[in-house]
């Protein structure tokens, strides 16, 4: 059964008239939207980075902050929306600037929990760059908590993963955290 057919079945199960004007193309649109929102499954880290790794003598912190992200909670398939802050300490190589955002998007465009998303991003940046440390903080609002359940409209989940010097060196961690404020 195709994704489109499954959306038709869901609408019918909800009691909707799937032949009414406003819903005629909804299953097709919903299937296309879901495929787009989950396109990270069709991407690999190698494809996303695409060789954009450059030699550099810089060993100071490199950070991209306020990277918008949109993902779907794996428990309810509802969106969570937020921003990621990603930093690393180069160890002879720097990553093309847009590639940090593309790594975030690749993992965010999968059914996820934010805790795992944060770790996947950190480990991918570490793997690709060979950095001596990586820090990732994600702040996001979860529709599964805002639209249903406890219905808390102003809640934000904050997660962090610190690897290498970001974990072992308090000054590095503090510098990173102060830069994202």
Curated annotation (Swiss-Prot):
Xref: Pfam families: GTP_cyclohydroI (PF01227)
Family annotation (Gene3D superfamilies): 1.10.286.10, 3.30.1130.10
Gene Ontology MF: a single term: zinc ion binding
Keyword Mitochondrion: no
Self-association and partners: Homomer.
Reactions catalysed: GTP + H2O = 7,8-dihydroneopterin 3'-triphosphate + formate + H(+)
Keywords, ordered alphabetically: GTP-binding, Hydrolase, Metal-binding, Nucleotide-binding, One-carbon metabolism, Zinc
Organism, scientific name: Azotobacter vinelandii (strain DJ / ATCC BAA-1303)
E.C. number: 3.5.4.16
Pathway: Cofactor biosynthesis; 7,8-dihydroneopterin triphosphate biosynthesis; 7,8-dihydroneopterin triphosphate from GTP: step 1/1
Name of this chain's protein: GTP cyclohydrolase 1
Gene that produces this protein: folE
Biological-process GO terms, alphabetical: one-carbon metabolic process; tetrahydrobiopterin biosynthetic process; tetrahydrofolate biosynthetic process
GO cellular component, one term: cytoplasm
Binding site for Zn(2+): 73, 76, 144
Family: Belongs to the GTP cyclohydrolase I family.
